[in-house]
A protein has these predicted regions:
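Formylglycine-dependent sulfatase
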Residues: 22-280
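Bacterial N-terminal signal peptides
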Residues: 7-18
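N-terminal secretory signal peptides that target proteins for export/translocation
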Residues: 1-4
C-alpha cells in the first residue's frame, strides 16, 4: 500500500550515450526503474538529512531531476496502472489494488508502455514489481526475469505485533541473510546482465524494486550504518490528518498499517525510520 505522501518514482535512463545516438541516429536503449513507496528521502531531493542514495544521486546529476512529483492515486495498483497504460484513474475506474488492469474494460483498447516500445522495434524485458503484484499483462514483455516473491521469503517477524495485534506487512529491522538473496539484489543483477549483453536490437527494460515498501527489511550491514540513537525524526504536526477526506483516513486506519501513535508509544519510531532509510 502506498501512503498519501509516498510516490512511485520512475527514472528513465538512456543507456546509450547521447553522442553515439547523435552520430549513428540509432534509437536509444531505455531503462525504467520503479521504486515502491519511495518518498523524497533521497540525497538529491533532501527529504531527510540522513538519507544515503549515491546511485540515484549520480543518475540525477546525469539527467533532469523532477522534484515536484504527484502520484495519480495514493495506492499501488491505480498509480502503476496509470503510468503503464497512460490512463488516469478517473478514466480507467481503477482506484484500489484490484482488479488487474488488463481485465478492465475501459483499458482494453489502451496500448501499454512496453507494447508501445515493442511496436517501435524494441525488445522488451522486465524484472521485479512493475505492475501491482506479480502478474503481468499477456504479451507485454519478450523476456521476464525474477518476479516478486520468487526469492528470499522472511517468515520470522522482528516486531511481534502492532496496533490491535495486527501483523500484516508491518515489520522492520535488519536481516542477517546474505545480501545477494534479497529480492531487489536479484532483480538488479538480472537487469545488469541484460544490459551488458548489448544486442543489436534496441531494448526497453522495466525493473521494479520492492523496497522501501513494508516490511522494511534490509541487510544487517546496511541497517547498522546509521545507528538508531543518531536518527533524526521527521516533524509530525498534531492534527495533520484532520483536513483529509474520509477515504484517506480509512486507508491509514487499515490494520496492516499501525497508527503513528503506536510507534511513539511503543518506542519504535526511531527504529522504523532507521529501517526505512536502510531500505533506501
Amino acid at each position: 500500500m502506498i501512503r498519501a505522501k509516498s510516490m512511485l518514482v520512475l527514472l528513465g535512463l538512456l543507456v546509450s550515450s547521447w553522442s553515439s545516438v547523435a552520430v549513428q541516429a540509432e534509437p536509444p536503449n531505455v531503462l525504467l526503474i520503479a521504486i515502491d513507496d519511495l518518498n523524497n528521502w533521497v540525497g538529491c531531493l533532501g527529504g531527510h538529512p540522513q538519507a544515503r542514495s549515491p546511485n540515484i544521486d549520480r543518475l540525477a546529476e546525469r539527467g533532469t531531476l523532477f522534484s515536484n512529483a504527484h502520484c495519480q492515486a495514493p495506492i499501488c495498483n491505480p498509480s502503476r496502472t496509470s503510468i503503464m497504460y497512460g490512463v488516469r484513474p478517473s478514466s480507467s475506474g481503477v482506484y484500489m489494488n484490484s482488479p488487474k488492469p488488463w481485465t478492465v474494460e475501459a483499458l482494453k483498447s489502451s496500448v501499454t508502455l512496453p507494447r508501445h516500445f515493442a511496436a517501435s522495434g524494441y525488445r522488451t524485458y522486465t524484472a521485479g514489481k512493475i505492475y501491482h503484484g506479480s502478474g503481468l499483462p499477456p504479451g507485454d514483455f519478450d523476456e521476464v526475469g525474477p518476479r516478486p516473491g520468487q526469492r528470499l521469503r522472511i517468515d520470522e517477524r522482528l516486531i511481534p505485533e502492532t496496533r490491535d495485534g495486527a501483523k500484516g506487512l508491518w515489520d522492520f529491522g535488519g536481516q542477517s541473510y546474505k545480501e545477494e538473496l534479497f529480492q531487489d539484489y536479484v532483480d538488479a543483477s538480472w537487469a545488469i546482465d541484460v544490459i551488458r549483453k548489448r544486442s543489436e536490437q534496441p531494448f526497453f527494460i522495466a525493473v521494479g524494486f520492492y523496497r522501501p515498501h513494508v516490511p522494511f527489511y534490509s541487510p544487517t550491514r546496511v541497517f547498522n550504518e546509521i545507528p538508531a540513537d543518531t536518527i533524526e525524526l521527521p516533524v509530525v504536526k498534531d492534527g495533520d490528518r484532520d483536513d483529509l477526506p474520509g477515504i484517506a483516513t480509512n486507508l491509514t486506519k487499515a490494520p496492516a498499517a499501525p497508527a503513528h501513535s503506536w510507534f511513539v508509544e511503543s518506542g519504535r519510531w526511531k527504529e522504523a525510520v532507521q529501517s526505512y532509510l536502510a531500505c533506501v
